[in-house]
Design a protein with these regions (language model features):
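Long C-terminal interaction/binding lobes of large macromolecular proteins
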Residues: 1-177
Length: 177
């Protein structure tokens, strides 16, 4: 329905970052100047790069599906983290952030006989489920998040100290402001 409002807080983080960059480009200006550190080991210099915000792109997922089998019989369905989730995760201990994000992004757990909606599972049961995952299983689930779209820009610059031409891919909103 065209009269429905878009709930920004439910958009995936990468969509919000992309929208923010586009709004910033229109409201304040299309370019931002950044000083990037030299990548040479013995150099402490920097290089300036002017980023045209209209040139920032969003990576496309390479095909890691949200439905992931963690054993032959057991699987989960994941979703991308949204604004509310990322805001909440920032408030907890950094060591716990990845696990808490994983718990919050599980939408379903299923086996060969049943599908369990995460909203119908208690927090305690969900915590026990995630706590019992092996490291290889957690790594497999992590591939979904590693494949998540990201805003990025390929920057080229010259160090003002050693003069070396360099390039670096900037990722995530924090890279641009």
């Amino acid at each position: 329905d065209e009269n429905e409002w878009l709930d920004v807080e439910k958009l995936p983080m990468f969509d919000i970052e992309y929208l923010f960059i586009k709004i910033r480009a229109v409201s304040v200006g299309e370019t931002v100047k950044l000083n990037l550190t030299c990548q040479e080991e013995q150099c402490n210099g920097t290089g300036e790069v002017t980023v045209n915000l209209d040139d920032i792109q969003c990576t496309k997922p390479t095909g890691v599906e949200p439905k992931i089998m963690i054993t032959d019989e057991l699987g989960v369905v994941l979703r991308y983290p949204d604004w509310n989730l990322m805001e909440g995760v920032q408030k907890i201990d950094s060591n716990q952030q990845p696990i808490e994000m994983l718990k919050a992004c599980i939408t379903e757990i299923f086996d060969s006989e049943s599908v369990y909606d995460a909203d119908d599972i208690s927090k305690k049961e969900l915590s026990e489920f995630v706590d019992n995952l092996t490291f290889p299983q957690i790594e497999k689930l992590g591939e979904y998040f590693d494949d998540m779209p990201k805003v990025f820009y390929d920057a080229s610059y010259k160090c003002n100290t050693c003069g070396k031409e360099q390039s670096r891919t900037l990722e995530g909103l924090q890279s641009f402001f």
